[in-house]
């Protein structure tokens, strides 16, 4: 079996404003559960942005409750999350995309850390 590299994704979804706050919280928890169980991802960060006004109406609503979730997965089961969004009427808009910028930043930090460790170990070895 080939190794598939873990990628960083951002998933933003908007919950209809007529859904009670308690139900919105449960819906966010369900999305997190789907990411962890079905998508086999690891959640890095959940941002509840709250109610925001839209620039234009979406499904006859002028505002909605925004949530952004950053997570890591191999991308093979990402369609499970999209299917959940599609069949959930309380979620009126969603978008999931890969964050190349965050992946690049993480790789750079790893390279710098490895270089610093290499310098540290070579300096430590010459003292003996």
Curated annotation (Swiss-Prot):
Swiss-Prot/TrEMBL keywords: Ribonucleoprotein, Ribosomal protein, RNA-binding, rRNA-binding
GO biological process terms held by the UniProt record: translation
Listed CDD domains: bS6 (cd00473)
A molecular-function term among this protein's GO annotations: small ribosomal subunit rRNA binding
Cystine residue pairs: none
Classification via InterPro entries: Ribosomal_bS6, Ribosomal_bS6_sf, Ribosomal_S6_plastid/chlpt, Transl_elong_EF1B/ribsomal_bS6
UniProt family annotation: Belongs to the bacterial ribosomal protein bS6 family.
Cited function: Binds together with bS18 to 16S ribosomal RNA.
HAMAP family: Ribosomal_bS6
Name of the protein described by the UniProt record: Small ribosomal subunit protein bS6
Source species: Thermotoga sp. (strain RQ2)
């Amino acid at each position: 079996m080939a190794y598939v590299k873990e990628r960083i994704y951002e998933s933003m979804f908007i919950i209809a404003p007529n859904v009670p706050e308690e139900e919105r919280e449960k819906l966010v928890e369900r999305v997190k559960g789907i990411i962890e169980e079905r998508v086999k991802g690891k959640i890095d960060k959940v941002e509840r942005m709250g109610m925001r006004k839209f620039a234009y109406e979406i499904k006859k609503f002028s505002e909605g409750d925004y949530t952004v979730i950053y997570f890591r997965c191999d991308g093979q089961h990402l369609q499970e999350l999209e299917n959940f969004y599609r069949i959930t009427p309380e979620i009126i808009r969603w978008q999931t995309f890969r964050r190349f910028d965050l992946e690049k930043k993480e790789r750079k930090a790893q390279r710098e850390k490895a270089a610093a460790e290499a310098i540290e170990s070579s300096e430590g070895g010459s003292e003996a």
